Amino acid sequence: MSSFLSKRFISTTQRAMSQLPKAKSLIYSSHDQDVSKILKVHTYQPKGSAESSILLKTLAFPINPSDINQLEGVYPSKPEKVLDYSTEKPSAIAGNKGLFEVVSLPSGVKNLKAGDRVIPLQANFGTWSTYRTCESENDLIKIEGVDLYTAATIAVNGCTAYQMVNDYIEWDPSGNDWLVQNAGTSSVSKIVTQIAKDKGIKTLSVVRDRDNFDEVAENLEKKYGATKVISESQNGEREFGNEVLPKILGPNAQVKLALNSVGGKSCTNIARKLSPNGLMLTYGGMSKQPVTLPTGLFIFNSIRSHGFWVTANSKRDPENKRKTVDAVVKLYRDGKIISPKEDIRTLEWDVNNLSDEGVLDLVNRGIATKGAKNMVVLKW
């Protein structure tokens, strides 16, 4: 009898040890332009066990435009909807990027330990959740030596900036090479100027006209290393382009790269500043206007125009994604670049005290706040 009870106790204990903690996630099973109609808070018991799965505790996740576009159903990359979360309909967990802490891991995992901070290697990970599980350490990238905000956004802002500057142009170290970019106040642009400065590349950043233009320009030049900041009206003025710009660039300047995340007239005007054989990379379209380029730039200046999508790059070459993250982390740790933290708006998710309705309201407010860069930080 005692032997039977002993075996039963051991069996019960083993099951208890194997069970993963319940996760609370923001899920969706359909799409809508009004994402508040389809986003739900759902608590479920994750599949798998502590002996087979890496258990991750979420520390923070950004609310990016790509996350919202996925919920709307208009983003090219979408997670598969599945029945793994104890839902009536196939569902997906929202969120692509985020920072996690390793809670526990199977004995076979060699390169991670409890307490390590990690980010997903690929998109569609489902980061808007208290806990996530991962079956392979190869699907994670370890992050050390940078702050929470930087780590949670590095896969988007840092990797985008680094790859655009480093992977497309053969730069001349003489100091005469330039790049031009619109959306000069964006987080990506602020990182671009710093990476470029570290490589000896000069930057011309274009920003929207505003009452405090001089203040904004001074901040971008002194804090983030832009060589020169101009307004969109200057960007489009023929007189400025013919008379003032050559003095800014210098006699031997080569504008080899244009970075476009706006489209429309802004895109046309930065393309006009490219030197012959220059390249324009388009990585966004904030104006929702098409990329419009004069025919003469192609025929007489032989410029090139390509799209850039960091998600596709990561999927095509995962190893380069790892190398990019490592390189960007090193730049941060060496003090070569800093994160534009003043742009961020922090939303706190108190895991132990915030109700489901409160969590949903918190995230929906972050989604609805136009122009803000929202970061949800989980308080444990």
UniProtKB/Swiss-Prot annotation:
Where exactly is the transit peptide annotated in this entry? 1-17
Pfam families (UniProt xref): ADH_N (PF08240)
Q: Which reaction does it catalyse?
A: a quinone + NADH + H(+) = a quinol + NAD(+); a quinone + NADPH + H(+) = a quinol + NADP(+)
Which cell locations does it reside in? Mitochondrion
- EC id: 1.6.5.2
One example GO MF annotation: NADH:ubiquinone reductase (non-electrogenic) activity
Which key words tag this protein in UniProt?
Mitochondrion, NADP, Oxidoreductase, Transit peptide
Q: Which GO terms describe its biological process?
A: fatty acid metabolic process
- Name a GO CC annotation attached to this entry: mitochondrion
Q: Which InterPro entries match?
A: ADH-like_N (IPR013154), GroES-like_sf (IPR011032), Mito_Enoyl-ACP_Reductase (IPR051034), NAD(P)-bd_dom_sf (IPR036291)
Q: Which domain of life is it from?
A: Eukaryota
The record's comment on protein family reads: Belongs to the zinc-containing alcohol dehydrogenase family. Quinone oxidoreductase subfamily.
Q: How does it assemble?
A: Homodimer.
- Functional description taken from the UniProt entry: NADPH quinone oxidoreductase that efficiently reduces 1,4-benzoquinone, whereas no activities are found for menadiones and methoxyquinones.
Q: What is this protein called?
A: NADPH quinone oxidoreductase
Q: Which organism is it from?
A: Kluyveromyces marxianus
Which classification does the entry list for the species?
Eukaryota, Fungi, Dikarya, Ascomycota, Saccharomycotina
The gene name on file is QOR
